Amino acid sequence: MAELPMIISVDDHIVEPADTWTSRMPAKFKEAAPHIVRKDMPDVTFVGGKLTVNEGGGGAPADWWIYEKLQRPLLRVDSAVGVPRDEVTMKGVTYEDMRPGSYSQKERLEDMDENHIEASLCFPTFPRFCGQTFTEAEDKELALLCVKAYNDYQVEEWCAGTGGRLIPLIIVPLWDAHLAAEEVRRNAERGVRAVCFSEIPAYLGLPSIHDPDNYWDPFFAACDETSTIVNMHIGSSSKMPSTSPDAPAAVGSSLTHINAELSMTDFLLSGLFERFANLKVAYSEGQIGWIPHLLHRMDVVWEDNRGWGGVADKVPNPPSSYFKDHVYGCFFDDPNGLRLIDEIGEDNITYESDYPHSDSTWPRTRQIAEKQMAGLTDEQRYKVVRGNAIRLFGLDFT
């Protein structure tokens, strides 16, 4: 068996530096832009899939993002690499408490070298996984400037000068599909091929992808025309799965793949891939073992319930037939999924390290990948750990 190729991780994260927005805002918006304040941290709970910052002072100092009415502390779970598992909690932290690779380009590249990672696609933290923070904001003029500032930071600072090792991933103003399309095209002109989107936009109070007025068509058309990949991270609907309001966090964490299942069902039964032949979607951190069953079930429903299922007119072919050309799964720990690689398709699977989150396999991503993929051929391993990502995002690697 050949040596494991250098990995391209399509799901990592960046903790934005404190001046990400203040350094890029027009003078009249500098004070209102997201900024960091250091203050004591009260208790934080994560129960029933909901994060709650409890009222009251006390506690150790933490760095807080302040933006409109939002006060959001940096948390240990935002940057958990290098920390013993028992110390990875919901407590607040400062930048000095975090591993520098969480927010600094130089140290991130060094940590990637240590982890056998050649290139990395990073999702945002303060904006949340698809820019929900700005979608929920009251001042939409400022919010649009914040979206553009974040994208400028991604392209001009975070990814700049890395020889393609850090792959730009932008956010868009989801509250206006036409503005979102403009932002996709603005960034495509400077080489960006990846955009964040919500796995289930209806959960955000936005139109669903089944909207009868085709609300999202301008956005999807822009992605289709520019070959921009639509990336959906678990939790990008701001609603994590859980079983009850008092269920412990471990329940929801064990069920995170469900959001990806819901979303993929939505897309494959939407007719979007009929109307946008070049549209491609990628699911981040959803794992892959569930894919064969879901494809089979959708095909059965499509065939047996075509009289009343509501999709016969817009999905003329079995839903599974659209998967190969349009949908990509991603995993960091799914040995069961790898045993189903022939059913899923070796060309539709990508890999991740999830740096610097608590699920991250850093600094042992290579060793874990080698163990998980021991039953794959050299060609399959190449495709999973880098080849499919190169093809999907048009990366300048071999």
Language-model-detected regions and their locations in the chain:
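Substrate-binding cleft and catalytic face of glycoside hydrolase catalytic domains
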Residues: 121-136, 161-165, 180
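Short aromatic-enriched loop/helix-cap "lid" or pocket-rim segments at secondary-structure transitions
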Residues: 19-22, 133-135, 209, 242-245, ...
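Catalytic pocket-lining loop regions of alpha/beta-barrel enzymes
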Residues: 142-143, 158-159, 164-167, 172-178, ...
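Conserved residues at the C-terminal ends of beta-strands
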Residues: 10, 16, 123, 198
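Histidine-centered catalytic micro-motifs
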Residues: 9-15, 230-235
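Surface-exposed, active-site-proximal loop segments in enzymatic domains
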Residues: 87-96, 128-142, 178
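Mid-to-C-terminal alpha-helical segments outside catalytic/metal-binding sites
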Residues: 2-8, 17-91, 95-119, 145, ...
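Short glycine-enriched loops at secondary-structure junctions
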Residues: 123-128, 234-239, 355-358
